[in-house]
């Protein structure tokens, strides 16, 4: 009983760390409220700023991707109970994000500056991105994604069941709405600086690469079900018009049209 309670408390602490890092990320990326943001901080030379910022983002990318791979999960399952594995992943990710926010070096050189309607539109898209990202976690299983469900199930002494494949709401429009939301939040800004551009470019590159590994894992887990989903639903960019399916019925071919 004590071990199960400790795992539950650990999961709650981990979720609290995630909440702090997520809320700070809103201010960090958008330059709102927080004392140190993507464009606000102590000045430093350009070379140091680029190097430190890339190292910080690389640290997050390596931890986030390596710990998500099935081979790593099999390895650390030898040492860590299943009920607290996700919480550990979330806690380490959150702490690295907080380190990034703390040690980030601003590069304030302006890239673009907008005003008026254009600025308000970009601010709107920015917040829409955060809303999409947050809502996407609740469309699947928010508490499973951040480790609380596993801890509560273990606390009750029941078996942790696997998740079935579902495509609710935004997942019918794009396969990875969470990542789409992040991209919108990172890129949509009325005042883009060189530091913000570096952040957006590096994270976009990471997301595009990481999704290839995630898709491979999903195919391995769900097989033909996910393959069919990939054929029907785009990865990140929604289709403006739904493509007509020709598998079941074909449109009549005009006379003289090539076979």
Curated annotation (Swiss-Prot):
Membrane topology per the entry is: Multi-pass membrane protein
Identify the GO cellular component terms for this protein: membrane
The organism's taxonomic lineage, starting at the top: Bacteria, Pseudomonadati, Pseudomonadota, Alphaproteobacteria, Hyphomicrobiales
Membrane-spanning segments: 5-25, 46-66, 88-108, 115-135, 182-202
Show the catalytic activity: methanethiol + S-adenosyl-L-methionine = dimethyl sulfide + S-adenosyl-L-homocysteine + H(+)
Q: Where in or outside the cell is it found?
A: Membrane
Keyword field contains NAD: no
Function (record text): Catalyzes the methylation of methanethiol (MeSH) to yield dimethylsulphide (DMS).
Q: State the Gene Ontology BP annotations.
A: methylation
Name of a matching Pfam family: NnrU
The alphabetized UniProt keywords are: Membrane, Methyltransferase, S-adenosyl-L-methionine, Transferase, Transmembrane, Transmembrane helix
Keyword Oxidoreductase set for record? no
Point out the signal peptide segment: none
- Tell me the protein's name: Methanethiol S-methyltransferase 2
Q: What class of enzyme is it?
A: transferase
Question: Record's NCBIfam families?
Answer: MeththiolMtaseMddA
Annotated family: Belongs to the nurim family.
One annotated GO molecular function: methyltransferase activity
EC number(s) given by UniProt:
2.1.1.334
């Amino acid at each position: 009983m004590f071990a199960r309670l400790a795992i539950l408390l650990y999961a709650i602490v981990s979720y609290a760390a995630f909440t702090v890092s997520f809320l700070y990320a809103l201010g960090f990326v958008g330059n709102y409220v927080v004392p140190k943001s993507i464009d606000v901080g102590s000045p430093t030379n350009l070379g140091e700023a680029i190097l430190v910022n890339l190292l910080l983002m690389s640290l997050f990318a390596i931890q986030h991707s390596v710990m998500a791979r099935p081979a790593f999960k099999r390895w650390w399952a030898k040492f860590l109970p299943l009920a607290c594995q996700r919480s550990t992943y979330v806690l380490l990710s959150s702490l690295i994000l907080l380190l990034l926010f703390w040690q980030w070096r601003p590069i304030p050189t302006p890239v673009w500056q907008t005003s008026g309607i254009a600025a308000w539109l970009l601010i709107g898209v920015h917040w829409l991105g955060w809303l999409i990202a947050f809502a996407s976690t609740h469309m699947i299983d928010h508490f499973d994604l951040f480790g609380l469900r596993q801890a509560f199930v273990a606390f009750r002494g029941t078996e942790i069941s696997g998740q079935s494949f579902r495509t609710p709401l935004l997942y019918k429009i794009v396969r990875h709405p969470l990542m789409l939301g992040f991209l919108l939040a990172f890129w949509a800004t009325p005042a883009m600086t060189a530091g913000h551009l570096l952040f957006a470019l590096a994270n976009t590159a990471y997301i595009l690469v990481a999704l290839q590994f995630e898709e491979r894992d999903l195919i391995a887990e769900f097989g033909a079900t996910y393959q069919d989903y990939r054929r029907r639903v785009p990865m990140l960019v929604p289709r403006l018009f739904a493509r007509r399916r020709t598998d079941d019925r074909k449109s009549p071919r005009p006379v003289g049209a090539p076979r």
